[in-house]
Amino acid sequence: MCFSFIMPPAMADILDIWAVDSQIASDGSIPVDFLLPTGIYIQLEVPREATISYIKQMLWKQVHNYPMFNLLMDIDSYMFACVNQTAVYEELEDETRRLCDVRPFLPVLKLVTRSCDPGEKLDSKIGVLIGKGLHEFDSLKDPEVNEFRRKMRKFSEEKILSLVGLSWMDWLKQTYPPEHEPSIPENLEDKLYGGKLIVAVHFENCQDVFSFQVSPNMNPIKVNELAIQKRLTIHGKEDEVSPYDYVLQVSGRVEYVFGDHPLIQFQYIRNCVMNRALPHFILVECCKIKKMYEQEMIAIEAAINRNSSNLPLPLPPKKTRIISHVWENNNPFQIVLVKGNKLNTEETVKVHVRAGLFHGTELLCKTIVSSEVSGKNDHIWNEPLEFDINICDLPRMARLCFAVYAVLDKVKTKKSTKTINPSKYQTIRKAGKVHYPVAWVNTMVFDFKGQLRTGDIILHSWSSFPDELEEMLNPMGTVQTNPYTENATALHVKFPENKKQPYYYPPFDKIIEKAAEIASSDSANVSSRGGKKFLPVLKEILDRDPLSQLCENEMDLIWTLRQDCREIFPQSLPKLLLSIKWNKLEDVAQLQALLQIWPKLPPREALELLDFNYPDQYVREYAVGCLRQMSDEELSQYLLQLVQVLKYEPFLDCALSRFLLERALGNRRIGQFLFWHLRSEVHIPAVSVQFGVILEAYCRGSVGHMKVLSKQVEALNKLKTLNSLIKLNAVKLNRAKGKEAMHTCLKQSAYREALSDLQSPLNPCVILSELYVEKCKYMDSKMKPLWLVYNNKVFGEDSVGVIFKNGDDLRQDMLTLQMLRLMDLLWKEAGLDLRMLPYGCLATGDRSGLIEVVSTSETIADIQLNSSNVAAAAAFNKDALLNWLKEYNSGDDLDRAIEEFTLSCAGYCVASYVLGIGDRHSDNIMVKKTGQLFHIDFGHILGNFKSKFGIKRERVPFILTYDFIHVIQQGKTGNTEKFGRFRQCCEDAYLILRRHGNLFITLFALMLTAGLPELTSVKDIQYLKDSLALGKSEEEALKQFKQKFDEALRESWTTKVNWMAHTVRKDYRS
């Protein structure tokens, strides 16, 4: 049976050749063009699911009939090459792959001599894996890119060499690191069975399951011993075995429990206890682990040979040149604005350029505006722009920002604009004219080696402006130029030449010398301390949240009392850095010296120093030094932000990129998420090279992980193809036929193999073993997400569900769910477990990704609909939810379910209020059969509530309906004790989050470059400051929250009306 989708003619040539369509059956053939080394061209009909090896044999049978066959070598001397779907030249070394999995851009295969260079083979594999050919980096001929790649290749090789000496146990710790947490929540002991754990263990290839009670403080090797004793008791003595011959593996997962940590510290066991589930283990023989280890060592040794064979020869030593430091140059900084072209404005429109020097968001001197010129193609200025700052005072990370503006008469704006949308961007109104932004571009004043830029440069600009601009410039924008040069506005700028010798920013030792020189002078020692009388004032300033602005006097006070800040208030460092005059070399030198003796900050506080406001190289190195104190689990919590702030780094080689690579290469779990966070954005032009070379470095240092990641990439490509076909044909096919066609596709061998036995990108511990095709479906929403269900082959394990989305940006969902996980962590640290359920979500590409399915759960809408015959009345049935819980729980289980509901409802009430989560209807609030309530779909956050005709549809600060209260009160109207406890939980949870308000503001600020539609400027983060009442006392803040709680309760009828409308629409569509 062939796939019954009908493709449009335009797609039939490419897409459905490799996908599944109505014209080519799964066992059908397609015409493929073959190009031989002799120049001969052959076309053959080839089965689309044939392996590369089979196709080569087919071709070889035919080449005998063509001229110059005698010039060809043996068949094994050749392999095929093609251009794949990502425009990467790929050599098909692995001949077990199917043609439909290779998916050439066009059905053309070139026969090439098999490469003997193992380095080239690795390069080809890396290019395919990261979705960007390494030849693209070579073709840039960029000295910085080449230097970084060379250093990272050496760095990766050193990491690989360090693996060679590892024991198999050390390798296991690094490859499959166990997740554990030393601190134990207070309420965990209440959920043990008389202070004991019950665990289930079975041996591989054995159906017997042994359950026994153990102490939560027992270590894993003791569990091995007890399991062996149980087996001996039942089956008698067999071969002599030792508990050290086995390792505990979590059933159904690639997760191992080993080492000296007590059982209760392992995350898996802790989760089982919290969820009242039975921890289930398999005793795996160590020899099996050793075999995996040996296979990876073989791959590692091959990689060492590959890397070393492909390393470029070292360059001959350069002659030592006399260099000058910029601190010796007291001349004003100036450039020449030569010309601009491709401005995309009418010939009569006048254009000017604004230029400014920034350090972070601080303007170092007044902006400069060029004269106004007009022109058809080129706009000629040849105009010197002199800035009010001397070269010696330029900080190392100074950036030069340009913006091109069209100058239009107010009355002629509509007729004069060619492509400008005046209403979209901020404008300057002056002297009866309006200045509209056309393009912007930024560049660093010093290059990656610290040399002051010289000579002519062409800056290809960007045309999309952010909502909020500084001085009508975009200092937070990238310093990379637009790679799409063909249509981009280009500015020709000339930096001053220095004919004698280049100017460099002083090295670190010169900076410290300068600071010592200043410190020895009488004037410097007068005012570094202020005495006790200033400390209360200083403390009040330093206690403010990160969004609070400092006035000039406050900044002077902080700088004056910098020694007091270091000794008494080390957490004041961010505010001290905002108080320094970065356009004054003396202050900068003193700060760098002070930074060397500044106490290390806790990692959570140091995160703020990676914000855009702190671009200084040594500050960021200090921040990374603080982050090194983080455990792997804590680092994973903030990895999303740490990847985003790479965009703030102006140069490729920086402390942060090295730190992330180092930790990723030391922990494969971190490595997997770093890989996907980078790869999901590698298509973005501004970061394509930066993220691409970091991905290359990770792959070179973790060749053993490449096979796992390649399997995931292949599976996601298959899902994307399937989803595209479903969307193309959803209108033509009814749901039943569409689902049948989907199942037909999934049953094909190419899809079945690609989508089976892979580690889940959402969680590397989870194995997606075998699709349960009959339960797979696509959903009704616009983008037709794929709902996939996997059977778990291991005894006693539930099925695993994942949703694949293609066409929706999941990064905002990722951010919101990360915040929910952090809230859960902070509450647990304070002894409050609110049973949160932040499910997995991962962006894996351009508007595509995966979402974890929470098993045994239903939406509020479905629960209500199933309890009523009339859709309009369903939303007002307050008994529906409680009755549903009673259907699945009784007795003590029902009491526990209501407790779970009460706690989780409190958690999500507070979380949705603090984060400003909008669009809350009955289809994006769900409940598990065990009682846990949780929210899904976070398309609107930070108070961006949906509105219609200018009227907000959501009037309540958070969702608290009477059917929720009915469950909390156990169905008893007068049960004020239960409701009072619920309210107290909400208030406690709110105050706990408020105490960590600065952390939430910092994390959102670090995401400003992510390009999320509802997080584009600092103004968006202001919502958090307001919801957490950070400018008020704790009493005032609690009073504000109590008012919001009462408002949610009082206005809950409006929620029910919205839910009724939603339920009626849903019922009508179904």
Curated annotation (Swiss-Prot):
Stretches the record annotates as Catalytic loop:
916-924
- Residue ranges for the region (G-loop) are 778-784
Q: Which domain of life is it from?
A: Eukaryota
Report which reactions are catalysed by this protein: a 1,2-diacyl-sn-glycero-3-phospho-(1D-myo-inositol-4,5-bisphosphate) + ATP = a 1,2-diacyl-sn-glycero-3-phospho-(1D-myo-inositol-3,4,5-trisphosphate) + ADP + H(+); 1-octadecanoyl-2-(5Z,8Z,11Z,14Z)-eicosatetraenoyl-sn-glycero-3-phospho-1D-myo-inositol 4,5-bisphosphate + ATP = 1-octadecanoyl-2-(5Z,8Z,11Z,14Z-eicosatetraenoyl)-sn-glycero-3-phospho-(1D-myo-inositol 3,4,5-triphosphate) + ADP + H(+); L-seryl-[protein] + ATP = O-phospho-L-seryl-[protein] + ADP + H(+)
Q: Where is this motif: Nuclear localization signal?
A: 410-418
Indicate yes or no for the key word Nucleus: yes
All copies of domain PI3K-ABD, residue ranges: 26-115
Give a brief account of the tissues where this protein occurs: Expressed ubiquitously.
Q: Which residues form the PIK helical domain?
A: 524-701
Quote the pathway field: Phospholipid metabolism; phosphatidylinositol phosphate biosynthesis
Q: What class of enzyme is it?
A: transferase
Biological processes annotated in GO: angiogenesis involved in wound healing; autophagy; cell migration; cell surface receptor protein tyrosine kinase signaling pathway; chemotaxis; embryonic cleavage; endocytosis; endothelial cell proliferation
Q: Where is the PI3K-RBD domain?
A: 194-285
Domain C2 PI3K-type positions: 327-496
Q: Where is this region: Activation loop?
A: 935-961
Any idea which GO molecular function terms this record carries? 1-phosphatidylinositol-3-kinase activity; 1-phosphatidylinositol-4,5-bisphosphate 3-kinase activity; 1-phosphatidylinositol-4-phosphate 3-kinase activity; ATP binding; insulin receptor substrate binding; protein serine kinase activity
Alphabetized SMART domains for the sequence: PI3K_C2 (SM00142), PI3K_p85B (SM00143), PI3K_rbd (SM00144), PI3Ka (SM00145), PI3Kc (SM00146)
The record gives the effect of mutating K342N as: Enhanced inhibition by PIK3R1 leading to reduced lipid kinase activity and reduced oncogenicity. Does not modify regulation by GPCRs
Q: PROSITE patterns annotated for this entry?
A: C2_PI3K (PS51547), PI3_4_KINASE_1 (PS00915), PI3_4_KINASE_2 (PS00916), PI3_4_KINASE_3 (PS50290), PI3K_ABD (PS51544), PI3K_RBD (PS51546), PIK_HELICAL (PS51545)
Q: Which residues carry this modification: Phosphoserine?
A: S324, S1070
Per the entry's comment, what about the domains? The inhibitory interactions with PIK3R1 are mediated by the PI3K-ABD domain and the C2 PI3K-type domain with the iSH2 (inter-SH2) region of PIK3R1; the C2 PI3K-type domain, the PI3K helical domain, and the PI3K/PI4K kinase domain with the nSH2 (N-terminal SH2) region of PIK3R1; and the PI3K/PI4K kinase domain with the cSH2 (C-terminal SH2) region of PIK3R1. The inhibitory interaction between the PI3K-ABD domain and the C2 PI3K-type domain with the iSH2 (inter-SH2) region of PIK3R1 is weak. The nuclear localization signal (NLS) is required for its function in cell survival.
Entry function: Phosphoinositide-3-kinase (PI3K) phosphorylates phosphatidylinositol derivatives at position 3 of the inositol ring to produce 3-phosphoinositides. Uses ATP and PtdIns(4,5)P2 (phosphatidylinositol 4,5-bisphosphate) to generate phosphatidylinositol 3,4,5-trisphosphate (PIP3). PIP3 plays a key role by recruiting PH domain-containing proteins to the membrane, including AKT1 and PDPK1, activating signaling cascades involved in cell growth, survival, proliferation, motility and morphology.
Protein family according to the UniProt entry: Belongs to the PI3/PI4-kinase family.
Q: How does it assemble?
A: Heterodimer of a catalytic subunit PIK3CB and a p85 regulatory subunit (PIK3R1, PIK3R2 or PIK3R3). Interaction with PIK3R2 is required for nuclear localization and nuclear export. Part of a complex with PIK3R1 and PTEN. Binding to PTEN may antagonize the lipid kinase activity under normal growth conditions. Part of a complex involved in autophagosome formation composed of PIK3C3 and PIK3R4. Interacts with BECN1, ATG14 and RAB5A.
The name under which this protein is listed is: Phosphatidylinositol 4,5-bisphosphate 3-kinase catalytic subunit beta isoform
